[in-house]
Amino acid sequence: MRKNKAKEIIKNGKAVINGWLQIPSTVSAETMAQQGWDSLTIDMQHGLVDYTNAMPMMQVISATEVVPLARVNWNEPGQIMKILDAGCYGIICPMVSNRKEAERFVQACKYPPHGYRSFGPMRGLIYGGPDYVDHANDEILKMAMIETKEALENLDEIMSTPGLDGIYIGPADLSLAIGEKPGFDKDEDTKAYSEILLSLIHISEPTRLDH
C-alpha cells in the first residue's frame, strides 16, 4: 500500500505542513497540490465541498506526492467510510467530546477486528494499491477535533483512545463553548489551550496538536 507521508512525518517528530481546501474546484485543488504542501485537507464541514466534488479533487491531488485528507461534517460512520473508499488517506473528525465518540470515530476508519469499517474501497484500491486492506488500518490518519466544553473535561480519555493519531483544536467552536466570541487572544482561550497542552504532556504516546 502507498505509504502515508503525513503519518511518517509525524512519527519522525516533525511538523506536517497542511493546506486547506474549501472551494469545490479541481483547478484550485490542482494548483494547491503544486505548492509543496505535505497534505491537503478537503473541508466537507464548513467548506462548500460535498462528496461529488471531493472525489475528483482527490484525483488531481493524487497526481502529486501530497497526501489527501478530509474533514467530514460529523462523526458519522457512513460518511467517513465513503470518503475513505474514495481514496482519502486521513480524516479530521469534528465535535469529539468523550472517549466513546473517539472510539466510534477511530473504529469507523478501521477494518475488523479493530474496527467496523465495511470493505469496498473502490478508488482506495487504485490510489493505495492492491494490498490496501492489509495496511489501511495503520496508514489512515485519524484526527479528533477538540472544540466543546465536554471535550475539555475529557481530554485524557480522548487522547488515550487506541488508534487515534492526534487532535485538532477547533478554535472558533471552542471559544463559543467556553462563553467567548471566536478568537485566539482572549485569556479563556489561552487557558483552554494550556489545558490541552498539559494533557498532551501527560499521555504516554505522542499526539500531534494542530489548529
Regions found by a protein language model. Give the residues of each.
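N-terminal amphipathic alpha-helix/helix-capping segment at the start of soluble metabolic enzymes
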Residues: 1-18, 129-137
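Hydrophobic faces of well-ordered beta-strands that scaffold small-molecule active sites
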Residues: 17-19, 40-42, 68-70, 91-93, ...
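Short, acidic/polar
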Residues: 21-33, 74-82, 150-159
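Glycine-rich, proline-tolerant flexible connector loops at the mouths of alpha/beta enzymes
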Residues: 28, 33-56, 172-187
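Acidic (Asp/Glu)-rich catalytic clusters
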Residues: 32-34, 55-63, 82-85, 159-161
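A short alpha/beta connector and helix-capping loop motif
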Residues: 50-76, 80-81, 104-106
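Conserved anion-binding
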Residues: 78, 88-162, 173-176
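Single conserved hydrophobic/aromatic residue that forms the stacking wall/gate
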Residues: 201-211
